């Protein structure tokens, strides 16, 4: 007697704890095997780029906080960097160091959220609590610097909003060895755990050629063996002053993406350590910026390395106080595109493991 199966449509989301945002995934399944996966996005679309056309350049900065709200500092920076490039504004050295410290602390905080929630999705409760314990220390540091805990609005065109308060650099220095010790504990608890490794090894695999054809960037690209990091390959700000490595793995699976992100935390700690040692004892935090910012007519595009990949900012200016056109290249949007390919033919139980390993933020996907 032949066993007959029946196709079924299964909705994951839009309200689901493992989607980490308002995201819907329509799965066509045959038994436990996925035949087709269709992502449905747009639930968090707010029209940021269109709104920006009616705002002055400085008024756009708070909107960038709300794209990838887990790494708001890098979003702030890419907009300011684009306007500074168009106008030829020179940023003071002290401000550049503050920017780098803020962005790298934000990168670690972002990866900690990913680590904790990813393992929670896989069934491990304790790492989630540990991750948020360490993240809280970073959030407190950034709160002292910017006055906010999540949407910082800290960067300014030409510099930063506030100088570092007294003793802040010393607190950052103390955080580095503390975080290194905790990171070692994470590896003992999870990375070397045989149950975890069997759960993610070989799952959600793609090749470097596929990664490039889908325009993947960041960890999702480097996990296939492509050594590409804009902080090294196209240095911006003062990243060319720091000695750090670009973590690369060859597997292209969930484990490779996990190991790349964990290694990135260590490299961010190296950058922070060097930035604290090199930090100028005094100096201005704002460059020479006109009272009313009017970018000259023309176009520019800049890109930087955010925690989820390359974030870019395109500005077309007609010489007014507002941009004629503003466009962000949002890495989560591009990284999500490979998901249907990864899920086809996979077991239903692997959906959450694969989605979590890509590490998307829906505010960034929808814009």
UniProtKB/Swiss-Prot annotation:
Q: What is this protein called?
A: NADH-quinone oxidoreductase subunit D
Care to name a GO molecular-function term for this sequence?
NAD binding
Has UniProt tagged this entry with the keyword Membrane?
Answer: yes
- What does the record give as the reaction this protein catalyses? a quinone + NADH + 5 H(+)(in) = a quinol + NAD(+) + 4 H(+)(out)
- Job description of the protein: NDH-1 shuttles electrons from NADH, via FMN and iron-sulfur (Fe-S) centers, to quinones in the respiratory chain. The immediate electron acceptor for the enzyme in this species is believed to be a menaquinone. Couples the redox reaction to proton translocation (for every two electrons transferred, four hydrogen ions are translocated across the cytoplasmic membrane), and thus conserves the redox energy in a proton gradient.
Class of enzymatic activity (EC top level) = translocase
> From what organism does this protein derive?
Geobacillus kaustophilus (strain HTA426)
Keyword annotations for this protein?
Answer: Cell membrane, Membrane, NAD, Quinone, Translocase, Transport
Q: Where in the cell is it found?
A: Cell membrane
């Amino acid at each position: 007697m032949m066993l007959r199966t029946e196709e079924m449509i299964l909705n994951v989301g839009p309200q689901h704890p493992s989607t980490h945002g308002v995201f819907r995934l329509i799965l066509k399944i045959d038994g436990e095997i996925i035949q087709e996966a269709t992502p449905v996005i747009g639930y968090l679309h707010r029209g940021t780029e269109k709104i920006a056309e009616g705002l002055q350049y400085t008024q756009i900065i708070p909107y960038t906080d709300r794209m990838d709200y887990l790494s708001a500092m890098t979003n702030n920076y890419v907009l300011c960097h684009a306007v500074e490039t168009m106008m030829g504004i020179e940023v003071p050295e002290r401000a550049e160091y503050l920017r780098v410290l803020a962005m790298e602390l934000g990168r670690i905080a972002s990866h900690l959220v990913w680590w904790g929630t990813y393992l929670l999705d896989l069934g491990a409760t304790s790492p989630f609590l540990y991750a948020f314990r360490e993240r809280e220390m970073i959030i407190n540091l950034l709160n002292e610097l910017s006055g906010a805990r999540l949407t910082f609005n800290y960067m300014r065109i030409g510099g930063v909003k506030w100088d570092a308060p007294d003793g802040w650099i010393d607190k950052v220095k103390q955080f580095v060895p503390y975080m290194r010790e905790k990171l070692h504990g994470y590896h003992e608890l999870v990375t070397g755990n045989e149950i975890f490794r069997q759960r993610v090894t070989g799952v959600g695999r793609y090749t470097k050629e596929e990664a490039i054809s889908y325009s993947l960037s960041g960890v999702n690209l480097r996990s296939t063996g492509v050594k590409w990091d804009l902080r090294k390959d196209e240095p911006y700000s003062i990243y060319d002053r720091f000695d750090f490595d670009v973590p690369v793995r060859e597997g292209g699976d969930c484990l490779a993406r996990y190991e790349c992100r964990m290694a990135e935390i260590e490299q961010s700690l190296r950058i922070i350590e060097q930035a604290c040692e090199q930090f100028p004892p005094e100096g201005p935090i704002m460059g020479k910026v006109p009272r009313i910012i009017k970018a000259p007519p023309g176009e520019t595009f800049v890109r930087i390395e955010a925690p989820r990949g390359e974030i870019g900012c395109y500005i077309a200016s007609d010489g007014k106080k507002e941009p004629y056109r503003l466009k962000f290249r949002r890495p989560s949007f591009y990284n999500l595109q490979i998901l249907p390919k990864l899920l086809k033919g996979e077991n239903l139980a692997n959906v959450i493991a694969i989605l979590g390993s890509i590490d998307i933020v829906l505010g960034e996907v929808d814009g």
